[in-house]
């Protein structure tokens, strides 16, 4: 048996195992099942741990690092993506349009190496992770990747003259000082069973919602007082192999694959566009794809459609019938102005303080 065949077989078994584990976890977290009560004691331990960590930082037993530049954290209080990365891209591009110099820091989930790094266009997902590459590609701003966000911020400030730094996730990273916190909530899944890890999907309690600057709902919401964010596409797909574009509705027959934290949202978005896929195949978030497995999914006349995040990992062995769907963020004019003006005020305040300090230092 050839090595590549054995490798594909092992990857297939790993995929099946991961999918089964994720299905069980989602069942416990998002359904009313008695199984969650068996994990509840561990959630109490988790609560005590995060409470102790919070107190240690609050009482200055552990150090919080502050910088002479505004840091905005875009995160959530549940496990999994709720639309954070598209929002980071949107905010980076909007601030760039307004002539502000923006940098981004990210954890870089799924990468093989742990050293801090600033992304360039030649880096691959195994070096810096799929989401940081996507942010860099779409927004064209400096992106630093490290499990230690303080190191990532210091790297950016060493090489770039920036006005603001955006942290993709990191809400629970207390050592990183910040002046703005935004929480993103997925309106479909919300908080699951409202329990803390591991009995539920929550990283911390809902009390955190009252302490942050903005709470943003991803999806339909009837409450007019809440900032609503919608994800949408422009009805075109891009070829992984040659970069050519095609109307989404012309992509038939189609097989959908998705390896993000909420695959159902992606599948639903495509179906609402009138596409009836032959199959919908879910992969775990940050999944490392196997060329042979993906190639075997389609026949000659079939198209393989994936998320843009998945395309970051698949473009190196792509086929001519593989496509991805770019996703964009939309806010109403009012919500957009509320968000951007609050960020710009902080930038201006920091600039004024720094200028004032420089004058005093010269005296």
From Swiss-Prot:
Keyword ATP-binding applies: yes
Keyword annotations: ATP-binding, Kinase, Lipid A biosynthesis, Lipid biosynthesis, Lipid metabolism, Nucleotide-binding, Transferase
Molecular functions per Gene Ontology: ATP binding; tetraacyldisaccharide 4'-kinase activity
EC number: 2.7.1.130
Keyword Kinase: yes
Domain of life of the organism encoding this protein: Bacteria
GO cellular component terms, A-Z: plasma membrane
Matching InterPro entries: LpxK, P-loop_NTPase
Catalytic activity annotation: a lipid A disaccharide + ATP = a lipid IVA + ADP + H(+)
Pathways per UniProt: Glycolipid biosynthesis; lipid IV(A) biosynthesis; lipid IV(A) from (3R)-3-hydroxytetradecanoyl-[acyl-carrier-protein] and UDP-N-acetyl-alpha-D-glucosamine: step 6/6
PANTHER family, per database record: TETRAACYLDISACCHARIDE 4'-KINASE, TETRAACYLDISACCHARIDE 4'-KINASE, MITOCHONDRIAL-RELATED
HAMAP family referenced in this protein's UniProt entry, alphabetically: LpxK
Function as written in the Swiss-Prot or TrEMBL entry: Transfers the gamma-phosphate of ATP to the 4'-position of a tetraacyldisaccharide 1-phosphate intermediate (termed DS-1-P) to form tetraacyldisaccharide 1,4'-bis-phosphate (lipid IVA).
Protein name in UniProt: Tetraacyldisaccharide 4'-kinase
Native organism: Wigglesworthia glossinidia brevipalpis
């Amino acid at each position: 048996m050839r090595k590549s065949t054995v490798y594909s077989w092992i990857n297939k078994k790993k995929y099946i195992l991961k999918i089964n584990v994720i299905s069980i976890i989602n069942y416990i977290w998002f359904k009313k099942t008695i199984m969650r009560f068996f994990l509840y004691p561990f959630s109490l331990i988790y609560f005590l741990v995060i409470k102790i960590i919070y107190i240690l930082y609050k009482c200055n037993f552990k150090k919080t690092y502050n910088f002479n530049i505004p840091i905005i954290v875009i995160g959530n209080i549940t496990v999994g993506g709720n639309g954070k990365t598209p929002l980071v891209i949107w905010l980076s591009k909007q601030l760039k349009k307004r002539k502000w110099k923006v940098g981004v820091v990210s954890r870089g989930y799924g990468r093989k190496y742990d050293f801090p790094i600033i992304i360039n266009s030649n880096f691959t997902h195994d070096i810096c992770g799929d989401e940081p590459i996507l942010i860099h590609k779409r927004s064209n701003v400096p992106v630093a990747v490290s499990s230690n966000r303080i190191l990532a911020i210091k790297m950016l400030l060493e090489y770039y003259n920036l006005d603001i730094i955006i942290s993709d996730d990191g809400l629970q990273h207390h050592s990183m000082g910040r002046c703005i916190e935004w929480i993103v909530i997925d309106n479909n899944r919300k908080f699951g069973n409202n329990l803390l890890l591991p009995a539920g999907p929550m990283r911390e309690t809902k009390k955190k919602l009252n302490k942050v600057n903005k709470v943003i709902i991803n999806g339909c919401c009837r409450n007019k007082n809440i900032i609503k964010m919608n994800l949408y596409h422009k009805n075109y797909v891009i070829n992984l192999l040659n970069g050519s574009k095609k109307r989404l509705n012309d992509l038939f027959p189609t097989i959908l694959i998705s390896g993000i934290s909420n695959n159902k949202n992606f599948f639903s978005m495509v179906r609402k566009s009138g596409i009836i896929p032959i199959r919908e195949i879910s992969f775990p978030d940050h999944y490392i794809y196997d060329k042979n497995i993906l190639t075997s999914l389609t026949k000659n006349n079939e198209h393989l459609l994936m998320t843009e995040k998945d395309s970051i990992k698949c473009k190196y062995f792509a086929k001519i019938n593989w496509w991805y769907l770019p996703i964009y963020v939309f806010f109403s004019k009012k919500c957009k102005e509320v968000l951007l003006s609050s960020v710009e005020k902080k930038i201006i305040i920091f600039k004024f303080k720094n200028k004032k300090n420089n004058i005093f230092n010269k005296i």
